[in-house]
């Protein structure tokens, strides 16, 4: 809302140099469809993402939180940018459907679910070795602080620090 910009001088300065448009609500208002809206500029009826999981009728299987980018059925911002300027470097940090996307740099949580029921912390990255470098410098991504009752600024700080580190590489 324009009135909120008075309380945010940095964002206000950014908006003063650019453009803004009203945000229209989307349905369903859950993580994957909303992120796909932002990455494509399209509504769920165009990009095809309507939930955080899928039910495959043929196999009677439910697929939840697998996060492969092929589910998005519309060009994304980095695809459009690369069409116009192939030399441009693009990055996407933490949208849940970014595995296998066309961005040059990608980072998103992808914990390993072990056969014994335990979980090992990990992130999917492009290039593949990027998470090892980020982990060596920043420690593992604090997944327990990303959502749920233990959510905290720790996960946000890691995301910001990792993006800054990757941008400098």
Regions found by a protein language model. Give the residues of each.
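His/Asp/Glu-rich, glycine-adjacent segments
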Residues: 42-169
């Amino acid at each position: 809302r324009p009135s909120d910009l008075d309380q945010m001088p940095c964002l206000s300065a950014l908006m003063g140099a650019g453009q803004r448009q009203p945000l229209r609500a989307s349905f369903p208002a859950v993580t994957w469809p909303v992120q796909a809206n932002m990455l494509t500029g399209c509504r769920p009826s165009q990009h095809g993402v309507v939930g955080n999981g899928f039910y495959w009728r043929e196999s009677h299987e439910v697929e939840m939180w697998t996060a492969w980018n092929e589910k998005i059925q519309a060009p994304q911002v980095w695809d459009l940018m690369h069409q116009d300027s192939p030399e441009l470097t693009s990055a996407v940090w933490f949208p849940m459907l970014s595995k296998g996307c066309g961005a040059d740099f990608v980072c998103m949580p992808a914990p390993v679910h072990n056969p014994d029921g335990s979980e090992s912390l990990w992130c999917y990255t492009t290039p593949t070795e990027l998470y090892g470098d980020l982990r060596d410098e920043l420690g593992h991504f604090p997944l327990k602080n990303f959502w749920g009752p233990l959510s905290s600024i720790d996960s946000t700080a890691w995301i910001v620090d990792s993006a800054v580190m990757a941008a400098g590489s």
